[in-house]
A protein has these predicted regions:
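Short beta-strand elements of ligand-binding domains
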Residues: 112-115, 139-145, 270-276
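Small/aliphatic-rich secondary-structure junction motif
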Residues: 2-55, 154-218, 237-239, 266, ...
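A short acidic, glycine-rich active-site loop
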Residues: 56-69
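Rossmann-fold cofactor-recognition segment
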Residues: 85-88
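Glycine-rich phosphate-binding loop signature in dinucleotide/nucleotide-binding domains
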Residues: 104-109, 233-237
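Short, structured interface segments
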Residues: 129-147
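Glycine-rich, Arg-bearing micro-motifs that act as flexible, cationic patches
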Residues: 113-131, 226, 242-266, 276-278
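Charged docking surfaces used in two-component/phosphorelay signaling
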Residues: 90-98, 221-225
Length: 278
């Protein structure tokens, strides 16, 4: 991959969400000094409709050429417009298997995926998204479903809970250094208090650890994820950072509690799921 501080791997298909994911990756790369690779896996069963082996091979080759041409056109267009180099590759195969093999081989710092409009309520139940959250220990950037950031320069950063805000992940620290806007911290309190107006810390000892932070506290209860999502949109966040649980209680867990999952599902803001490091 390109020689840069970070390496972004953008997973695409032929959906609009893939285009949004690539644009978000480009905007992020400009700010944090990252190289970009685009990877596209297409299942053969989407192409093959013949029993004759020769016909199958011919069809696969035609589809490979057509798919690579379409991908090259998309990547080259964005690369030329944004003046940033992008490398890309394409293959046929099982989507999850090929992606896992490619991640193992290239070791990207951030995997970037689009957010499809879910047929069901839970977007995070999507096969690839769920697989990555369970198995990939690095950062995952989930692009907004219908939102493309104009720039990550001076981006408005939001954090879901204190552990996300205080996380020492390097990419988050780099983004913090490149913004002058107050951070937004969204917390769900296990109390009977009402939703508070946004407040800022005023005590010196608190300022030293979480200075320049606006806090939104929500009562745990009915529709708290709706309330959080509403305030995320209202504050025009550019990126929401979410920390996975260090020790997952279940082997099948994606490392996000129910409230975090619901909030991600209901917001269009790009979400950076932070590395699951012990």
């Amino acid at each position: 991959m390109l020689e840069s501080k970070y390496r972004l791997l953008v997973l695409i298909d032929q959906t609009k969400s893939s285009y949004t994911a690539l644009r978000n990756a480009v905007n992020l790369a400009k700010v944090i000094d990252a190289g970009i690779e685009v990877f596209y896996v297409k299942p053969p069963m989407q192409v093959v409709r013949y029993d004759n082996q020769i016909a199958v091979m011919r069809t696969l080759e035609e589809e490979r050429i057509a798919s690579k041409k379409a991908m090259r056109k998309l990547v080259d267009t964005i690369s030329d417009i944004e003046n940033i180099p992008i490398i890309y590759s394409f293959t046929f195969g099982n989507v999850i298997t090929e992606i896992q093999n490619h991640i193992t081989k290239t070791q990207p710092d951030v995997v970037v995926i689009g957010k499809r409009k879910p047929k069901m309520v839970n977007f995070l139940g999507d096969g690839l998204t769920s697989y990555l959250l369970k198995n990939h220990k690095g950062e995952i950037l989930i692009s907004g479903s219908d939102k493309n950031l104009t720039s990550y320069h001076d981006v408005s950063l939001g954090f879901l809970d204190d552990t996300s805000l205080n996380n020492e992940v390097e990419i988050v620290q780099d983004l913090k250094k490149r913004t002058h806007k107050p951070f937004k911290l969204f917390k769900i309190k296990k109390t009977g208090s009402q939703l508070k107006k946004p407040i800022t810390f005023s005590k010196p000892e608190e300022q030293s650890s979480v200075a320049n932070t606006v806090i939104f506290e929500f009562e745990e209860g009915m529709d708290d994820s709706n309330s959080v999502s509403k305030y995320i949109e209202k504050n025009k966040l550019g990126l929401l950072c979410v920390k996975r649980e260090t020790k997952q209680k279940l082997s099948k867990s994606i490392g996000l509690n129910d409230k975090a999952q619901q909030t991600i599902n209901k917001t269009n803001v790009p979400v950076l799921v932070l590395a699951n490091k012990k």
